[in-house]
Each structure stands twice: as structure tokens, then as C-alpha cells.
Amino acid sequence: MRHIIELKDGWQFTNLDGQTSEVSIPHTWNAIDGQDGGDDYKRGTCTYTLALQKPEFDPDTQEVWIEFDGVNASAQVSLNGQDVCSHDGGYSTFRANLTGLLADENELVVKADNSKNDRVYPQMADFTFYGGIYRMVRLLVVNKAHFALDYLGSSGIRVTATPEGAGAKVRVQSRVTTGDVTVTVIDRKGRVAGTGTGLDTTIEMAKARRWHGVEDPYLYTARCEVTVDGSVTDRLEIPFGVRSFRVDEKHGFILNDEPYDLHGVSRHQDRKGIGNAITREMHDEDMALIREIGATTLRLAHYQHDQYFYDLCDRNGLIVWAEIPYISKHMPNGRANTISQMEELIEQNYNHASIVCWGVSNEITIATKDKQDMLDNHRLLNDMIHQTDPTRFTTLACYAMCGPFNKVAHITDVVSWNLYLGWYVPGLFLNDLWIGFWHLCYPKRLLGYSEYGAEGMPNLHSDHPRRNDHTEEYQAVYHEYMLRCFRRHPWMWANHVWNMFDFAADARDQGGEPGMNHKGLVTFDRKTKKDSFYLYKAWWSSDRFVHICSKRFVDRCGKKTTIKVYSTDDTVTLMVNGKTVGKKTSSDHVFTFTVPLDGDLDVEAFSGLKKDTAHFHKVDKPNPAYKLVKNKNAQKSNWVDN
């Protein structure tokens, strides 16, 4: 059976300046300089060296493999001076067989390279390309008869579950080095639901509970075993869900033959002071916050995420858009890399019930218009996806300035747009016009919003919020409009807020904090939920609550002030300094009260048994700390212009 050894500690890291220090994996060398602005974080080749003791194994019957979950962006691996493997693409798993190269004492060297080049994606994007071995490294000691470890970093097993009536057919395809395969399907209670044998076996289940999104994310397990002469030599357990899905021009996304509203967020994986070298506990925290607002879908941008997080999506019922970092700028020398990254994305994630579509590219027309090579690359990827995985549909995210008639917008099965009308472009009403115009031109071609949002700083506030002021209040006003807008267009297939969390983009200088994109509903450190977070929770979640907005906007001036409240309920009562000042109803979860500002205010908002409180202080003049002070010497705030 498999024996797994994590190679976490004792690595010697040599940076670009030739300085060496001891580090633990996961690790990135850009955790600080990739988040502080200036577009000057260190990019190049750094070296990780590990004194590796040969694990116990029988070379006559066993093999030793090394597995990397993620090295950004290119990796060169050697053992005792001999080349082992190389890999281009910083977000996917890759492995190599070390069996014939191991001595008793070994020197393992990994060169990680995030240098600028013209062949490995991404090279131009609004996020930091952290260099390093930022996901786990392991040794795998396996019997020679095992599930394939050399096929595109995958498990070597594909599970395809097709609903049929009240039951299902479960096809399990296996790649093995040698031996026979036995498959046992087990339900959540550990009961056997079906068995099969062979490299390509189909198991019929008379009854099969559906995986139905956040309402019922029911998972089965395919226990797959390699046997030789009746003895089990390798075993993997693959969770899978039984579900059907499609898109419909009238009702959007359909799950298990029922309309299923896809409203959710996008996610970048990085953290403050940590970069992309995050832990499972951090993944868990992200998922808990996403579930709290009631999201039903998640766009995992702009690259392959950690396998553990896809597992969390399966278990929590989120519908996932998965994509490769073919982004912003088409590179003629990068075609092979787009293909290899897409192949790895599909093979490594094929069994995840949560994933319904593969994203081909993001905003590719920022730097490349509808040129033939770019279009050919997209058609090649689109065709390859359909051939490799006919069970899912394709999509892409178009750049805001990519018009509805651009050819690239009509290659994939469905399309989405990254649109910031009301943020980068004045006029929130333009969203309704744009959506309506698209639907008029292409009534049978499904549209979604893959990105929409506005920057919001929890320390910036205004009585009269306006576009580009970066206040928490304008971000909330923006999202209030967008939620009402999408309600007016129920045929859209999916909409994703950009972003669930603030994230690092070292080329940016906006909001008074260089190196950051502040469009998140939650701050970079995950410690502060902005008002917009509670707005979405009010619209999407069934958890009853009341939230008073602008609590951080403490100092207020004038004769009157506005108190805004979000709640899942349709009625809210407001008390100020112990007296009831109003009771309001709302169909959009937003309740606005205007109250006299005669002095300090102790405010309480009630809905049923739920309550929230806030304190506001009367001042003579606006607090200057609440207003963004723009740095005249700062670089251009729009990263595209840099």
C-alpha cells in the first residue's frame, strides 16, 4: 500500500542575491515584496535544497516518487546532480520517479523560476505571481503495481456518474502500471452501493442520491484497488457526486433538471504577509466565509487552486468555474503551455462534482485583439476540452472593452464579461443597458458576469459616496444596484463578485495602500467583513441577522445623518438613544433611516430577536482621515496602463 512522507522542513533556500536560509514548505519569496506596490517584486530563479534520506522500501517490489502540488512558475528538479524532471505551470501537480536515482543520503535540488518570459502563463495580470514551492512536497512509496502516477499529475482514475431515473451509472476508468482493478462504490454511511472490476467498468446503482449544490452536496466514494494474484497493492478512494447539469436560455443554469440560481464570488488564494503559501486552516476559513454569505457558485481565478479547496467545494456544494491562467496577453510562443495547463487542470480535477465548466481564458483582448493566432489558440483549447471532457461546458471571461461582436466572445459554449460599469466607467445604469443589448443581439447565447465590483476601504467613509472615492459606502451602493440589476435579468447563467477577498497586485497603487486590489468583500487578512459582505449575506443567506452599516464611520457632522441597515428579514425597527425612531419594510434587504444628529448617537436595529448596535459621534467638521489622499507621485492606478 502507499506510504506518504511530507517533505516539509529542513529546506535550504537560496534567494536571488545568493543568500541562504532555512525554510519550511510551503514557501514563497514574494510574501512581502509582492504586496507592497511598485511592481518591483523579485522575479527570477531561486534554489531549494534538501538533504534527503532514502526512505525504507524494497526496490524489487516498490517505487519511490516525488510529488509537487505547486511550484511557481517553472521548476527544474535534480537529485544528486542528475536531472529528474522539469515543469512549466505554477499551479498544478507534477511528479517524478526517483527509484533508480536514490542513494542512502541524497541532495534534492529544486530550482523555482518566476522570471518574465514569453512562453509560460501568466505573464501579464492584475495579481502577483508569487515565486516558490508554495504547496506541499511529498515522497510516495508505492508497490510496482499501482495506479498511474505519471499521467498529467492525475490520480490515474476517472469517475463519471450519470443519473438514470432514480439510479445512476458510474463509469470508472483506471490507468495502472500492472494488475487488476476492483471498484466498490460506498455511500455516506459506509454501505456498499455497487461493485465492478476492470480498467473500464460501469457500475449500475438502482438508487442514487443526487449531489444538489449547497442544498444537498451528497458524495459517494469509489474505493479503487489494484490487485495482483488476489492481493491489494494500491488503493485510492475517490469522492464523487451524481448530478446532471446544463444551461438554458430562459432559466440560466439547470441542476438535476431544476433551475438553480448561480450567484457567488471569485477567489484569489493569497494572504497578507504569507502570499500563496497558505495552510489548510486558511482554506477552511475562506470556505466558511464564502458559505456564510450564501454563495452558490465560485469562480476559482485565475489558475488551478489547491486540491484541498476543490474538495471543500465538493463537500459544501458550491458550483465551480475552474480555469487556467491564459490571461491578458496572448503569447504566440505560449500555445503549448496553454494546452498542457488545460490538460493538467482537467485530468487532475475531473472527479470533482463541484466543477461544471472549464474557463479557457480571462481578458485575453486587453493586449491582444481578435488576431488569428489568438483565435486559433482558443478554438484549439475549446475543441480539446470537448474531446477530453464531454461532460462539462466551456466558458471564458471577456475584457470590458471587448465588444459583444468580437469573435473571441463566440467560441466557447457560454460566455461571461468582466464589467465594472459604475466603477471604472461612470453610470451604474449602463449595466442594465449592456445586458439588455446583449440579450437583444444574442437571445439564445447565455451571458454571465464573471467579474464586477468596486474598491472599498474600511477606513474611508463619506456621507455622499461617489465613484472612485474608495469608501466603504460607495462599494455598498454599487453592490446594492448590481443585485437589483441581476434580479431584473434572471436568464443570466452565473454572476460572480470580484472579489471575495482583497488580494495582492504589486503593480497597483489605489485606495491609499499600494500593491493591493481592494474589491474584496473581506479584507486581505480575513479579519474585517466590509458592509458589502453583509449586503450579500442579506440577499443570499437564510441566516437571520441585522447589520448596521458604516459602523466605522463614527465621526459625523451636520444636522441629520443617515443610518442604513441590512437584514435578511423584510422589516427592521431602529432605536436611537433608547427611543424608537422608525420601523421600515423593504423588498431588497436595505433599510434607510434619516435621524437628527443632535449629539452622540447610540443606535440599535432590531428584527425579531436579532439585534445590532452602533455608536456615532457628532463633530463640527468632517474627519479628514475618512477621505482618500491621492499621492501625486504614485504610479498610474490602473494596472493596464503600466
State where each predicted segment sits.
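Secreted/periplasmic carbohydrate-active enzymes, especially glycoside hydrolases
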Residues: 1-302, 310-312, 316-320, 341-344, ...
